[in-house]
């Protein structure tokens, strides 16, 4: 007797994956459960969006449910059927009969959130398949793209899917939803007791926080100064203050200074011990050693500071490493880059202006993607040295066009004593806000304690005009 042809296991696998992952039963249970119990809506809306439903008719039904909830209308068999009829899509979803079937086949809504999780998980699998296909296509036909760019795009797309496990409402939003969340945030802030007005990450400097309301999520913040003004010191102080005030990590990319030197500066700053003594290890007395030990213990207890001192980093390197720390630690409070001009973008290496533009653009995109403030240090042009008033302005930023455009906040550091030996403002630094997208420009004065590698609040402030 002739043997039957055998089906290869690979053919079976192909047949199994030809239909994208989905669960019709789970989708039906979610929709039927909502009709039975509207009180579960908020939990459902946090887990799934209309596009998570594989079946087209289910997407239409869920979309109409969203409209009804937005209008504070109950969702039941009658109201949903009438709403679908008024939009002319009742026949497309199967009419009243199909809605009744959904309702009748769902005995209760006890497990509705578990069903919603199934719908979302299947949607994520479909997204992974789609992304995987695009990655494969780009790999087969790279079209001259650098391998790092292909890897970065692949990582970005997969990372975006992972993020959607907690935020499934990306894409265009109706302004009604945005208004509700905005008013809710304003209401929460208005009810806080002893609220300082800081809505972002505190800078640690009272008057600077008053001007900026802190360093805001998704903002690109540029800190610029001529050499010897304390640019890196100020940046590290921002990192220290953010790390001490927040539980989420601070990530520092130090392209100029080794990690040990960064830590020496931070220890000197927080312990208020002369940084020369720390750097040389000489003449430290018992009190100073105790201060150092206390700061070390504080860092170990917080355990929320990461330093990457790799040199020559590209935007791809910074993005991938930031995403990893973000993912492994459940978020970030701030990212610091010291400094922008030491980064490189190989694809634009023939044109420095375009290279800086790409670096600046990528840092802004990273801030928006991770919803954290990204602080980047920048150099200033030497031409300001030729002016009588050497206080920096936005046009003094080296390769300034793209940096000025991408930045949400630009801060310059100016210390008059660097230029004038007889300055009346010895030990005083001006933080000049040259641009603030959502706030005023102006100046803030801080105390500069160079021996401790730190800036401090200035007890007595002189009045400065904010017309700078």
UniProtKB/Swiss-Prot annotation:
It comes from Haemophilus influenzae (strain ATCC 51907 / DSM 11121 / KW20 / Rd). SMART domains: AAA (SM00382). The main replicative DNA helicase, it participates in initiation and elongation during chromosome replication. Travels ahead of the DNA replisome, separating dsDNA into templates for DNA synthesis. A processive ATP-dependent 5'-3' DNA helicase it has DNA-dependent ATPase activity. PANTHER family: REPLICATIVE DNA HELICASE, REPLICATIVE DNA HELICASE DNAB. Homohexamer. GO terms for molecular function: ATP binding; ATP hydrolysis activity; DNA binding; DNA helicase activity. CDD domains: DnaB_C. Residues 1-22 are annotated as: Disordered. GO terms for biological process: DNA replication; DNA replication, synthesis of primer. Residues 194-462 form the SF4 helicase domain. It holds the Pfam family DnaB_C. ATP binds at residues 225-232. Keywords: ATP-binding, DNA replication, DNA-binding, Helicase, Hydrolase, Isomerase, Nucleotide-binding, Primosome. Gene3D superfamilies: DNAb Helicase, Chain A (1.10.860.10), P-loop containing nucleotide triphosphate hydrolases (3.40.50.300). One of its GO terms (cellular component) is primosome complex. Coiled coil: none annotated. This is Replicative DNA helicase DnaB. The gene is dnaB. Belongs to the helicase family. DnaB subfamily. Its EC number is 5.6.2.3. It catalyses: Couples ATP hydrolysis with the unwinding of duplex DNA at the replication fork by translocating in the 5'-3' direction. This creates two antiparallel DNA single strands (ssDNA). The leading ssDNA polymer is the template for DNA polymerase III holoenzyme which synthesizes a continuous strand; ATP + H2O = ADP + phosphate + H(+).
């Amino acid at each position: 007797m002739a043997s039957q042809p055998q089906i290869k296991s690979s053919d079976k696998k192909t047949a199994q994956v030809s239909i994208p992952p989905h669960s019709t039963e789970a989708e039906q249970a979610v929709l039927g459960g909502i009709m039975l119990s509207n009180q579960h809506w908020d939990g459902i809306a946090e887990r799934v969006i209309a596009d998570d439903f594989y079946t087209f008719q289910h997407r239409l039904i869920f979309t109409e449910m969203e409209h009804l909830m937005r209008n504070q209308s109950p969702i039941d068999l009658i109201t949903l059927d009438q709403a679908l009829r008024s939009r002319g899509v009742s026949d497309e979803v199967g009419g009243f009969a199909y809605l009744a079937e959904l309702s009748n086949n769902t005995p209760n809504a006890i497990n509705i959130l578990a069903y919603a999780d199934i719908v979302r998980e299947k949607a994520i699998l479909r997204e992974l398949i789609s992304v995987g296909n695009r990655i494969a296509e780009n790999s087969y036909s790279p079209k001259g793209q650098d391998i790092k760019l292909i890897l970065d795009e692949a990582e970005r797309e997969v990372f975006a899917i992972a993020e959607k496990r907690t935020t499934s409402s990306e894409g265009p939003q109706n302004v009604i939803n945005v208004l509700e969340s905005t008013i809710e945030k304003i209401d929460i802030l208005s009810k806080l007791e002893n609220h300082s007005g800081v809505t972002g990450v505190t800078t640690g400097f009272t008057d600077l926080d008053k001007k900026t309301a802190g360093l805001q999520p998704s903002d690109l913040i540029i800190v610029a100064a001529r050499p010897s003004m304390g640019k890196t010191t100020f940046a590290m102080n921002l990192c220290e203050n953010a790390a001490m005030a927040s539980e989420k990590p601070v990530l520092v990319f130090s392209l100029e200074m080794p990690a040990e030197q960064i830590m020496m500066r931070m220890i000197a700053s927080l312990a208020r011990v002369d940084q020369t003594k720390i750097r040389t290890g000489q003449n430290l007395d018992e009190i100073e050693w105790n201060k150092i030990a206390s700061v070390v213990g504080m860092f170990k207890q917080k355990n929320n500071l990461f330093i990457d001192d790799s040199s020559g980093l590209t935007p791809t390197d910074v993005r991938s490493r930031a995403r990893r720390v973000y993912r492994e630690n459940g978020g970030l409070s701030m990212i610091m880059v010291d400094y922008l001009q030491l980064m490189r973008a190989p694809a634009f290496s023939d044109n420095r202006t375009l290279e800086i533009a790409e670096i600046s653009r990528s840092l802004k995109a990273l801030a928006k993607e991770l919803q954290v403030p990204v602080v980047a240090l920048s150099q200033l042009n030497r031409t300001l040295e030729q002016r009588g008033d050497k206080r920096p302005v936005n046009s003094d930023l080296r390769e300034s066009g793209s940096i000025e455009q991408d930045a949400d906040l630009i801060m310059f550091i100016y210390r008059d004593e660097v230029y004038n030996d007889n300055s009346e403002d010895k030990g005083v630094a001006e933080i000049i806000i040259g641009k603030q997208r959502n706030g005023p420009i102006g100046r803030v004065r801080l105390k500069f304690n160079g021996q401790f590698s730190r800036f401090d609040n200035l007890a007595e402030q002189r009045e400065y005009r904010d017309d700078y």
